[in-house]
Every structure is written in structure tokens, then in C-alpha cells.
Regions:
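N-terminal intrinsically disordered, cationic/polar leader segments
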Residues: 8-139
Length: 139
């Protein structure tokens, strides 16, 4: 019975959170890139990323590294922190986390190049690294 209640709660929580996915982008704020003609790489690293395993309901921990070459906009760090924290209570697979972050940042920044890398803590003796990329690095 407890397992059934847990699964129903996870299903309801995931349904609510899936409906909120588009609103996560609201956290992301930008500022003007003062050097748009220069191809310099900006890298941000969140060493305390957390989400929830959608299968077990247990917390997942990882390091998210975001690197990009800005076009007209750069990401504001406080907003990035709040955006990444919004995954804290969401049941989501590693692959989906990285691709959603990539899609959201590309939509907001419209960068020349962007890479999102997730290095997730060992679970069941296996650690996972997921990398997704947009654009050309040497544009």
C-alpha cells in the first residue's frame, strides 16, 4: 500500500512539474554582451546540483558545467542559480536534465555555441556523464 501511495505521489508530482517545465525559463535573466565580436568562452559550474530519480524517488547529485560563446547576451548568475535549483524536487532522468538546460539556455541566449555537461554521482556502482552541445565552437 505504501509503495502504491509513493508511486501515485511521484506520478502526480511529475505531472505537475511537467506542466511547469516551460515556466522554468522565467528564472533565466540576461545582460548585454559587451564584446559580441570576440569569441571568448564563458564557463559556469554548479557543484551542488540536485534532482530526484524518477524511478526511486531518491535524490540525485551532480556537477553541471555550462560553457558558451555569447552572441548578444550573457546569462545572469543569480538567475542561473535559481533556474538550476528549480530542478531540486523534480523527478527527471539525467539525459533529460542536460537536454532541457541546453534547450532553455539556447532559447534565452541565442549563443554562437553552448555546451552543457552533467557529471552525476555514482549510483549502483555506475557514475554518469551526459554532454549536449549546440552550434559550432569555432564560429
Amino acid at each position: 500500500m505504501n509503495l502504491l501511495i509513493f508511486m501515485l505521489n511521484m506520478l502526480l508530482k511529475n505531472t505537475i512539474l511537467l506542466n511547469m517545465n516551460n515556466s522554468k525559463r522565467k528564472y533565466l535573466k540576461t545582460f548585454i554582451n559587451s564584446y559580441p565580436s570576440r569569441n571568448y568562452i564563458i564557463t559556469h559550474q554548479a557543484k551542488e546540483f540536485t534532482s530526484i530519480c524518477p524511478k526511486t524517488g531518491q535524490p540525485d547529485f551532480g556537477i553541471i558545467t555550462i560553457s558558451y560563446i555569447a552572441e548578444k547576451k550573457c546569462i545572469e548568475l543569480k538567475s542561473l542559480k535559481h533556474y538550476l535549483q528549480s530542478f531540486r524536487n523534480e523527478g527527471i532522468f539525467y539525459e533529460n536534465i542536460i537536454n532541457r538546460i541546453l534547450d532553455d539556455l539556447v532559447k534565452v541566449l541565442k549563443p554562437k555555441w553552448l555546451e552543457v555537461k552533467g557529471e552525476f554521482s555514482t549510483r549502483g556502482g555506475i557514475n554518469s556523464i551526459v554532454v549536449a552541445e549546440y552550434g559550432k565552437k569555432n564560429k
